[in-house]
Amino acid sequence: MKKDLISNHIQLDDSGKLIHLLGLEGLSKQYLIHILDTADSLIDVSGNLKKSKALDDIFVANLFFEPSTRTRNTFEIAAMRSSANVINVDLANSALKKNEDLLNTMRTLKAMQIDMFVIRHKQNGLPHHVVQHLKDVSILNAGDGINAHPTQALLDMLSIRQHKKTFENLSVAIVGDITHSRVAHSDIQALKTLGTTDIRLIAPKVLQYNLAPCSVVKHFDDIEPGLKNCDVVIVLRLQKERMIEADIPNEQEYFDNFGLTPKRLALAKPDAIVMHPGPTNRGVEIDSNVADGNQSIILQQVTNGIAVRMAVMQILVNKS
Protein backbone atom coordinates (compact mmCIF):
# COMPACT_ATOMS: atom_id res chain seq x y z
CA MET A 1 0.00 0.00 0.00
CA LYS A 2 1.62 3.27 -1.06
CA LYS A 3 2.16 5.72 1.79
CA ASP A 4 0.40 8.54 -0.07
CA LEU A 5 -2.74 6.40 -0.23
CA ILE A 6 -2.85 5.92 3.54
CA SER A 7 -5.09 8.85 4.38
CA ASN A 8 -7.20 9.04 7.50
CA HIS A 9 -9.83 11.47 6.21
CA ILE A 10 -12.12 8.54 5.41
CA GLN A 11 -12.52 7.75 9.11
CA LEU A 12 -14.81 10.79 9.56
CA ASP A 13 -18.28 11.31 8.14
CA ASP A 14 -19.43 14.57 6.53
CA SER A 15 -20.32 16.04 9.93
CA GLY A 16 -16.88 15.24 11.37
CA LYS A 17 -18.04 12.30 13.47
CA LEU A 18 -15.64 9.40 13.92
CA ILE A 19 -17.07 6.34 12.17
CA HIS A 20 -13.82 4.35 11.88
CA LEU A 21 -10.52 4.55 13.77
CA LEU A 22 -7.68 4.06 11.31
CA GLY A 23 -5.04 6.40 12.72
CA LEU A 24 -4.64 9.56 14.79
CA GLU A 25 -3.39 11.88 12.10
CA GLY A 26 -6.14 14.33 11.22
CA LEU A 27 -7.89 14.09 14.58
CA SER A 28 -7.91 17.34 16.56
CA LYS A 29 -6.56 17.85 20.06
CA GLN A 30 -10.14 18.27 21.25
CA TYR A 31 -11.17 14.93 19.72
CA LEU A 32 -8.25 13.09 21.32
CA ILE A 33 -9.16 14.63 24.68
CA HIS A 34 -12.79 13.55 24.12
CA ILE A 35 -11.64 9.95 23.66
CA LEU A 36 -9.39 10.13 26.75
CA ASP A 37 -12.19 11.68 28.82
CA THR A 38 -14.58 8.95 27.70
CA ALA A 39 -12.03 6.28 28.67
CA ASP A 40 -11.49 7.96 32.04
CA SER A 41 -15.23 7.86 32.70
CA LEU A 42 -15.08 4.07 32.37
CA ILE A 43 -12.61 3.74 35.27
CA ASP A 44 -13.89 4.13 38.83
CA VAL A 45 -12.13 5.99 41.65
CA SER A 46 -10.44 2.76 42.76
CA GLY A 47 -8.94 2.23 39.31
CA ASN A 48 -11.29 -0.60 38.42
CA LEU A 49 -13.02 -0.86 35.06
CA LYS A 50 -16.75 -0.26 34.91
CA LYS A 51 -19.22 -2.32 32.92
CA SER A 52 -21.55 -0.75 30.37
CA LYS A 53 -24.60 -1.62 28.27
CA ALA A 54 -23.51 0.79 25.52
CA LEU A 55 -22.84 -1.93 22.93
CA ASP A 56 -25.83 -4.11 23.72
CA ASP A 57 -27.00 -5.84 20.50
CA ILE A 58 -23.75 -4.85 18.70
CA PHE A 59 -21.71 -7.65 17.07
CA VAL A 60 -17.93 -7.24 16.90
CA ALA A 61 -15.60 -9.48 14.85
CA ASN A 62 -11.88 -9.63 15.65
CA LEU A 63 -9.63 -10.42 12.67
CA PHE A 64 -6.01 -10.72 13.78
CA PHE A 65 -3.64 -11.69 10.98
CA GLU A 66 -0.58 -11.22 13.22
CA PRO A 67 0.14 -12.90 16.56
CA SER A 68 -1.31 -11.01 19.52
CA THR A 69 -2.10 -11.69 23.14
CA ARG A 70 -2.56 -8.33 24.88
CA THR A 71 -4.21 -6.42 22.06
CA ARG A 72 -6.65 -9.12 20.96
CA ASN A 73 -7.62 -10.02 24.52
CA THR A 74 -8.09 -6.40 25.58
CA PHE A 75 -10.26 -5.71 22.53
CA GLU A 76 -12.34 -8.78 23.35
CA ILE A 77 -12.68 -7.81 27.02
CA ALA A 78 -13.47 -4.20 26.08
CA ALA A 79 -16.29 -5.33 23.81
CA MET A 80 -17.65 -7.76 26.40
CA ARG A 81 -17.51 -5.15 29.18
CA SER A 82 -19.58 -2.93 26.90
CA SER A 83 -22.12 -5.78 26.46
CA ALA A 84 -21.23 -6.46 22.81
CA ASN A 85 -21.38 -9.90 21.21
CA VAL A 86 -17.86 -10.90 20.14
CA ILE A 87 -16.50 -13.42 17.67
CA ASN A 88 -12.81 -14.15 17.15
CA VAL A 89 -12.54 -15.31 13.55
CA ASP A 90 -10.52 -18.52 13.29
CA LEU A 91 -8.31 -17.41 10.42
CA ALA A 92 -6.32 -20.65 10.36
CA ASN A 93 -9.47 -22.56 9.42
CA SER A 94 -11.33 -19.85 7.52
CA ALA A 95 -12.15 -19.60 3.83
CA LEU A 96 -9.04 -17.43 3.48
CA LYS A 97 -7.09 -20.67 3.56
CA LYS A 98 -9.02 -21.64 0.44
CA ASN A 99 -7.73 -18.50 -1.28
CA GLU A 100 -10.88 -16.49 -0.69
CA ASP A 101 -10.26 -12.76 -0.97
CA LEU A 102 -10.21 -10.91 2.38
CA LEU A 103 -12.89 -8.46 1.27
CA ASN A 104 -15.16 -11.34 0.25
CA THR A 105 -14.66 -12.94 3.66
CA MET A 106 -15.53 -9.66 5.36
CA ARG A 107 -18.57 -9.11 3.13
CA THR A 108 -19.77 -12.58 4.13
CA LEU A 109 -19.29 -11.77 7.81
CA LYS A 110 -21.07 -8.44 7.33
CA ALA A 111 -24.00 -10.35 5.84
CA MET A 112 -24.13 -12.15 9.19
CA GLN A 113 -24.94 -8.73 10.71
CA ILE A 114 -21.49 -7.83 12.03
CA ASP A 115 -21.46 -4.16 13.10
CA MET A 116 -17.75 -3.64 13.70
CA PHE A 117 -14.48 -5.23 12.58
CA VAL A 118 -11.27 -5.01 14.61
CA ILE A 119 -8.37 -5.70 12.24
CA ARG A 120 -4.66 -6.31 12.74
CA HIS A 121 -2.62 -6.97 9.60
CA LYS A 122 1.01 -6.87 8.48
CA GLN A 123 0.20 -4.73 5.43
CA ASN A 124 0.42 -0.97 5.80
CA GLY A 125 -2.93 0.64 5.03
CA LEU A 126 -4.98 -2.56 4.92
CA PRO A 127 -7.76 -1.16 7.17
CA HIS A 128 -7.95 1.94 4.95
CA HIS A 129 -8.36 -0.31 1.90
CA VAL A 130 -11.18 -2.19 3.61
CA VAL A 131 -13.02 1.04 4.51
CA GLN A 132 -13.02 2.09 0.86
CA HIS A 133 -14.71 -1.15 -0.21
CA LEU A 134 -16.94 -2.12 2.72
CA LYS A 135 -19.77 0.23 3.64
CA ASP A 136 -22.07 0.61 6.65
CA VAL A 137 -19.78 -1.10 9.13
CA SER A 138 -17.16 0.35 11.51
CA ILE A 139 -13.49 -0.55 11.05
CA LEU A 140 -11.09 -0.31 13.99
CA ASN A 141 -7.38 -0.54 13.25
CA ALA A 142 -5.61 -2.76 15.80
CA GLY A 143 -2.26 -2.25 14.05
CA ASP A 144 -1.32 -2.22 10.37
CA GLY A 145 2.25 -3.08 9.44
CA ILE A 146 4.60 -0.36 10.64
CA ASN A 147 2.05 2.33 9.86
CA ALA A 148 -0.18 2.93 12.89
CA HIS A 149 -1.52 1.55 16.16
CA PRO A 150 -4.00 4.22 17.24
CA THR A 151 -5.53 2.57 20.32
CA GLN A 152 -2.08 1.81 21.76
CA ALA A 153 -1.14 5.47 21.39
CA LEU A 154 -4.42 6.52 23.01
CA LEU A 155 -3.88 4.22 25.99
CA ASP A 156 -0.34 5.55 26.27
CA MET A 157 -1.68 9.11 26.33
CA LEU A 158 -4.27 8.16 28.96
CA SER A 159 -1.54 6.57 31.09
CA ILE A 160 0.65 9.67 30.80
CA ARG A 161 -2.26 11.97 31.64
CA GLN A 162 -2.99 10.00 34.82
CA HIS A 163 0.51 10.81 36.10
CA LYS A 164 1.36 14.19 34.56
CA LYS A 165 -0.63 17.42 34.72
CA THR A 166 -0.12 18.51 31.14
CA PHE A 167 1.33 17.31 27.84
CA GLU A 168 2.66 20.71 26.84
CA ASN A 169 5.67 20.84 29.17
CA LEU A 170 6.69 17.20 29.01
CA SER A 171 9.94 15.72 27.75
CA VAL A 172 9.15 12.28 26.34
CA ALA A 173 11.85 9.79 25.34
CA ILE A 174 11.00 6.89 23.02
CA VAL A 175 13.77 4.28 23.15
CA GLY A 176 14.21 1.31 20.84
CA ASP A 177 13.32 0.07 17.38
CA ILE A 178 11.57 3.18 16.13
CA THR A 179 11.87 2.36 12.42
CA HIS A 180 9.62 -0.69 12.61
CA SER A 181 7.31 0.45 15.42
CA ARG A 182 3.76 1.46 14.55
CA VAL A 183 3.42 2.32 18.25
CA ALA A 184 6.18 4.92 18.00
CA HIS A 185 4.65 6.43 14.87
CA SER A 186 1.23 6.78 16.52
CA ASP A 187 2.68 7.97 19.85
CA ILE A 188 4.62 10.72 18.07
CA GLN A 189 1.46 11.84 16.27
CA ALA A 190 -0.58 11.86 19.49
CA LEU A 191 2.06 13.72 21.48
CA LYS A 192 2.43 16.38 18.79
CA THR A 193 -1.34 16.85 18.59
CA LEU A 194 -1.61 17.17 22.38
CA GLY A 195 1.09 19.84 22.45
CA THR A 196 4.26 18.07 23.58
CA THR A 197 7.26 20.08 22.40
CA ASP A 198 10.15 17.80 23.43
CA ILE A 199 9.99 14.33 21.89
CA ARG A 200 13.27 12.40 21.88
CA LEU A 201 13.78 9.40 19.63
CA ILE A 202 16.63 7.25 20.96
CA ALA A 203 17.90 4.41 18.79
CA PRO A 204 20.85 3.19 16.74
CA LYS A 205 20.94 5.07 13.46
CA VAL A 206 19.76 2.00 11.54
CA LEU A 207 16.61 1.88 13.71
CA GLN A 208 15.74 5.58 13.66
CA TYR A 209 12.60 7.04 12.08
CA ASN A 210 13.14 9.28 9.07
CA LEU A 211 10.76 12.09 10.00
CA ALA A 212 10.41 15.28 8.05
CA PRO A 213 12.23 18.14 9.84
CA CYS A 214 10.27 18.98 12.98
CA SER A 215 11.24 21.33 15.79
CA VAL A 216 9.63 19.21 18.53
CA VAL A 217 11.34 15.92 17.62
CA LYS A 218 15.02 15.29 18.31
CA HIS A 219 17.07 12.22 17.36
CA PHE A 220 19.67 10.61 19.64
CA ASP A 221 21.96 7.67 18.92
CA ASP A 222 23.31 7.82 22.49
CA ILE A 223 20.82 6.88 25.21
CA GLU A 224 22.28 8.85 28.10
CA PRO A 225 21.90 12.42 26.78
CA GLY A 226 18.53 11.41 25.38
CA LEU A 227 17.23 10.42 28.81
CA LYS A 228 18.53 13.44 30.70
CA ASN A 229 15.74 15.16 32.67
CA CYS A 230 12.92 13.50 30.73
CA ASP A 231 9.46 12.99 32.26
CA VAL A 232 8.35 9.89 30.37
CA VAL A 233 10.33 6.96 28.95
CA ILE A 234 8.57 4.71 26.42
CA VAL A 235 10.61 1.57 25.71
CA LEU A 236 10.13 -0.47 22.53
CA ARG A 237 11.23 -4.00 21.70
CA LEU A 238 13.36 -5.00 18.72
CA GLN A 239 10.93 -6.10 16.00
CA LYS A 240 13.15 -8.74 14.46
CA GLU A 241 10.27 -10.11 12.39
CA ARG A 242 10.24 -6.87 10.38
CA MET A 243 14.02 -6.52 9.95
CA ILE A 244 16.35 -7.83 7.31
CA GLU A 245 18.87 -10.17 8.90
CA ALA A 246 21.79 -7.80 8.41
CA ASP A 247 20.09 -5.12 10.53
CA ILE A 248 19.26 -7.32 13.54
CA PRO A 249 21.47 -6.18 16.45
CA ASN A 250 23.26 -8.54 18.78
CA GLU A 251 21.01 -8.62 21.85
CA GLN A 252 23.74 -8.28 24.46
CA GLU A 253 25.41 -5.48 22.54
CA TYR A 254 22.07 -3.74 22.13
CA PHE A 255 21.34 -3.99 25.86
CA ASP A 256 24.80 -2.67 26.69
CA ASN A 257 24.22 0.38 24.50
CA PHE A 258 20.46 1.02 24.61
CA GLY A 259 18.92 -1.10 27.38
CA LEU A 260 17.03 0.85 30.05
CA THR A 261 18.82 0.07 33.31
CA PRO A 262 18.32 1.62 36.78
CA LYS A 263 21.52 3.62 36.30
CA ARG A 264 20.30 5.07 33.01
CA LEU A 265 16.80 5.72 34.33
CA ALA A 266 18.38 7.80 37.10
CA LEU A 267 19.31 10.34 34.40
CA ALA A 268 15.61 11.10 33.93
CA LYS A 269 13.61 13.15 36.41
CA PRO A 270 13.00 11.45 39.78
CA ASP A 271 9.26 11.22 39.04
CA ALA A 272 9.70 9.95 35.48
CA ILE A 273 7.40 7.11 34.45
CA VAL A 274 8.45 4.07 32.42
CA MET A 275 6.15 2.58 29.77
CA HIS A 276 6.28 -0.35 27.36
CA PRO A 277 3.60 -1.57 24.90
CA GLY A 278 4.64 -5.20 25.41
CA PRO A 279 5.72 -7.82 25.00
CA THR A 280 8.84 -6.98 27.00
CA ASN A 281 12.16 -8.65 26.34
CA ARG A 282 13.99 -8.35 29.63
CA GLY A 283 17.72 -8.09 29.32
CA VAL A 284 17.38 -6.80 25.75
CA GLU A 285 15.59 -3.43 25.80
CA ILE A 286 14.77 -3.19 29.52
CA ASP A 287 16.22 -4.41 32.81
CA SER A 288 13.86 -6.41 35.03
CA ASN A 289 14.52 -4.05 37.93
CA VAL A 290 13.15 -1.20 35.80
CA ALA A 291 10.22 -3.15 34.34
CA ASP A 292 9.13 -4.17 37.86
CA GLY A 293 10.24 -0.98 39.59
CA ASN A 294 8.27 1.80 41.26
CA GLN A 295 8.46 4.03 38.19
CA SER A 296 7.01 1.41 35.84
CA ILE A 297 3.35 1.78 34.83
CA ILE A 298 3.42 -1.10 32.34
CA LEU A 299 0.57 -3.04 33.96
CA GLN A 300 -1.49 0.14 34.32
CA GLN A 301 -1.16 0.53 30.55
CA VAL A 302 -2.78 -2.88 30.09
CA THR A 303 -5.81 -1.89 32.18
CA ASN A 304 -6.02 1.47 30.41
CA GLY A 305 -6.01 -0.37 27.10
CA ILE A 306 -9.36 -1.91 27.94
CA ALA A 307 -10.85 1.46 28.95
CA VAL A 308 -9.59 3.15 25.78
CA ARG A 309 -10.91 0.38 23.53
CA MET A 310 -14.27 0.47 25.28
CA ALA A 311 -14.36 4.23 24.72
CA VAL A 312 -13.45 4.02 21.04
CA MET A 313 -16.01 1.30 20.32
CA GLN A 314 -18.73 3.28 22.07
CA ILE A 315 -17.84 6.45 20.20
CA LEU A 316 -17.86 4.63 16.86
CA VAL A 317 -21.41 3.43 17.40
CA ASN A 318 -22.37 6.83 18.84
CA LYS A 319 -23.32 5.46 22.23
CA SER A 320 -20.65 7.05 24.43
UniProtKB/Swiss-Prot annotation:
One of its GO terms (molecular function) is aspartate carbamoyltransferase activity. Carbamoyl phosphate binds at residues 70-71, 120, 149, 152, 278-279. It comes from the Bacteria. Signal peptide: none annotated. PROSITE patterns: CARBAMOYLTRANSFERASE. Pathway: Pyrimidine metabolism; UMP biosynthesis via de novo pathway; (S)-dihydroorotate from bicarbonate: step 2/3. GO terms for cellular component: cytosol. L-aspartate binds at residues 98, 182, 237. GO terms for biological process: 'de novo' pyrimidine nucleobase biosynthetic process; 'de novo' UMP biosynthetic process; amino acid metabolic process. InterPro entries: Asp/Orn_carbamoyltranf_P-bd, Asp/Orn_carbamoylTrfase, Asp/Orn_carbamoylTrfase_sf, Asp_carbamoyltransf, Asp_carbamoyltransf_Asp/Orn-bd. It catalyses: carbamoyl phosphate + L-aspartate = N-carbamoyl-L-aspartate + phosphate + H(+). SUPFAM superfamilies: Aspartate/ornithine carbamoyltransferase. Its EC number is 2.1.3.2. Pfam families: OTCace (PF00185), OTCace_N (PF02729). Keywords: Pyrimidine biosynthesis, Transferase. Disulfide bonds: none annotated. PANTHER family: ASPARTATE CARBAMOYLTRANSFERASE, ORNITHINE CARBAMOYLTRANSFERASE, MITOCHONDRIAL. Belongs to the aspartate/ornithine carbamoyltransferase superfamily. ATCase family. Catalyzes the condensation of carbamoyl phosphate and aspartate to form carbamoyl aspartate and inorganic phosphate, the committed step in the de novo pyrimidine nucleotide biosynthesis pathway. Heterododecamer (2C3:3R2) of six catalytic PyrB chains organized as two trimers (C3), and six regulatory PyrI chains organized as three dimers (R2). This is Aspartate carbamoyltransferase catalytic subunit.
